[in-house]
Regions:
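Residue-level signature of alpha-solenoid helical repeat scaffolds
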Residues: 48, 97-98, 140-144, 164, ...
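Core helices of alpha-solenoid repeat scaffolds
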Residues: 10, 69-80, 112-121, 135, ...
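Eukaryotic helix-linker segments that join adjacent hydrophobic helices
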Residues: 49-53, 59-61, 71, 95, ...
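N-terminal alpha-helical scaffolding segments that mark the starts
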Residues: 1-59, 65-69
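Helix-loop junctions that connect tandem helical modules in alpha-solenoid scaffolds
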Residues: 19-38, 79-88, 105-107, 121-131, ...
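HEAT/armadillo-like alpha-solenoid scaffolds in large eukaryotic assembly and transport factors
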Residues: 57-70, 106-116, 148-160, 177
């Protein structure tokens, strides 16, 4: 069940990046050829994770749940990282949704305590995307990390970074704001 939810999210990410790199008109003017290459990289990386997820669910019943579900976190987070670097709100929003699910399913071995700093870095990298849905995803992801019994940050510096990220995401950014 969990891997099917992840498969769906990675499929959506691949679809969004494919649309972004193949679109025409004003969007393609804004989404330059260099960014179109980024879109292809995101799509390829997401499809690579999809293949790994499908293979992990089709393994034999003799493997343990942890081995069955444990795919290298670098590989799992590669399309997420590329999407966050693109700064496109729809890609960033989908990527943060994937991060939320990975963190939420940490009990099943999808995300480990070592990945908290990676997640924090991703959240800080997309903080400047001023789309309201992205800001909401940042807040939700911080909450999921703080509530996770397995991933709850152990040191004060990480907790402070997460809480300050929440406050910055909640700060209104209008014309009068600097």
């Amino acid at each position: 069940m969990a891997s099917s939810m992840l498969e769906h999210d990675y499929r959506q990410l691949a679809l969004l990046s494919r649309k972004a790199s193949a679109s025409s008109g004003l969007t393609s003017f804004i989404w330059s050829s260099n960014n179109a290459k980024e879109g292809e990289e995101i799509k390829d990386s997401a499809e690579r994770v999809l293949l790994l997820l499908r293979n992990s669910t089709s393994t034999t019943a003799t493997t343990t749940t942890t081995n069955e579900r444990r795919i290298d976190s670098e590989t799992m987070l590669a399309p997420v990282r590329l999407s966050c670097q693109s700064r496109r709100p729809e890609l960033v929003g989908q990527a943060l949704g994937i991060v939320q699910k990975l963190v939420g399913m940490s009990e099943e071995g999808w995300c480990t305590a070592a990945d908290v700093h990676t997640v924090l870095g991703l959240l800080q990298s997309v903080e400047a995307v001023y789309d309201e849905s992205v800001q909401l995803k940042i807040l939700q992801t911080c909450l999921v990390v703080l509530q996770s019994p397995r991933l709850h940050p152990r040191n004060a510096e990480t907790i402070l970074s997460l809480v300050s990220l929440c406050f910055r995401a909640m700060t209104p950014r209008g014309k009068g704001q600097v």
